[in-house]
């Protein structure tokens, strides 16, 4: 129930920096011009304990351990706002395969799940604004797919503060996000969203070789569905890419 205990022992014994140097690097607080950041090592252990109260899923625990792993490498100081860690979620996701390989963990769908959760862990809380569009919710649901519940669980576990009033405010904001996601999901059934037209089908119909154009057309369809410009149907998607391709000067040799 408190896996942080073992990591604390490794930290105190000096073994952590040998076994898991990336996690060790999260330790410490830097102060500049009166502005500091939290100790991301102890924050990570708190997130790990939080998620362990909600689930015994090993891979969600690994997502908790790795969610901020790239913060030391992305740390910058801005005189106006203080310390920033822009892009730590993307860099952290890039690190997941190499960390898994070194730890002799499986490089399969479990690794891909952890990678996805690390990459997306900031996204739900960014949807707090009252003016957030349904399209923004759809985009998150599309990217998270079946793992949307796991992602929300990780984000909730990521709420740590010694100030209980602040925690309650964050939890209230997070509940607002969950309600928005539920509302859009019940209306659009996007949890298992699949693009109605595959890259292979685009190449078959237009006699194209694998290329950047194929990926761009497929992305156009996804964005059009998310923005509610077209229904999630094959015929609508096909007509849309024909029209968009023509407007952008892409010439197809149709079979």
Q: What are these regions, as identified by a protein language model?
A:
Residues 29-38, 48-49, 105-168:
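Histidine/acidic-rich helix-loop-helix segments that form or flank divalent-metal centers
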Residues 9-10, 47, 92, 118, ...:
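A residue-level signal for conserved active-site and pocket-lining positions in enzyme catalytic cores
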Residues 98-99, 161-255:
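Charged substrate- and nucleic-acid-binding regions of tRNA-handling and nucleotidyl-transfer enzymes
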Residues 19-25, 81, 136, 186-189, ...:
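Glycine-rich, flexible loop/turn motifs
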Residues 1-62, 69-87, 91-109, 198, ...:
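Glycine- and charge-enriched loop/helix tracts that form the active or gating conduit
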Residues 64-67, 90, 94, 98, ...:
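Feature representing long, continuous alpha-helical segments
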Residues 16-21, 33, 67-69, 122, ...:
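Short hydrophobic/aromatic-rich motifs at helix boundaries and adjacent loops
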Residues 52, 56, 65, 70, ...:
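Hydrophobic alpha-helix feature that most strongly marks membrane-spanning transmembrane helices
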């Amino acid at each position: 129930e408190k896996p942080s205990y073992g990591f604390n022992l490794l930290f105190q014994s000096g073994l952590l920096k040998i076994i898991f140097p990336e996690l060790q690097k999260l330790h410490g607080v830097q102060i500049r011009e009166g502005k500091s950041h939290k100790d991301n090592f102890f924050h990570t252990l708190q997130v790990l304990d939080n998620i362990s109260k909600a689930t015994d899923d090993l891979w969600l625990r690994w997502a908790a351990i790795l969610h901020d792993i790239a913060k030391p490498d992305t740390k910058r100081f801005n005189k106006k706002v203080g310390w920033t860690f822009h892009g730590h979620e993307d860099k952290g996701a890039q690190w997941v395969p190499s960390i898994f390989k070194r730890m002799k963990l499986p490089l399969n769908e479990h690794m891909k799940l952890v990678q996805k959760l690390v990459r997306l862990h900031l996204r739900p809380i960014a949807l707090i604004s009252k003016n957030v569009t349904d399209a923004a919710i759809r985009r998150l649901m599309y990217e998270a797919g079946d793992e949307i519940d796991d992602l929300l669980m990780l984000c909730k576990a990521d709420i740590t503060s010694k100030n209980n009033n602040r925690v309650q405010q964050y939890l209230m904001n997070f509940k607002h996000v969950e309600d928005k996601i539920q509302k859009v999901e019940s209306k659009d059934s996007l949890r298992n969203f699949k693009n109605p037209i595959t890259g292979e089908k685009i190449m078959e119909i237009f006699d194209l070789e694998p290329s950047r154009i194929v990926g761009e057309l497929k992305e156009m369809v996804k964005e059009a569905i998310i923005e509610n410009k077209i229904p999630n149907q094959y015929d609508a998607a096909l007509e849309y890419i024909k029209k968009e391709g023509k407007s952008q000067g892409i010439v197809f040799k149709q079979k």
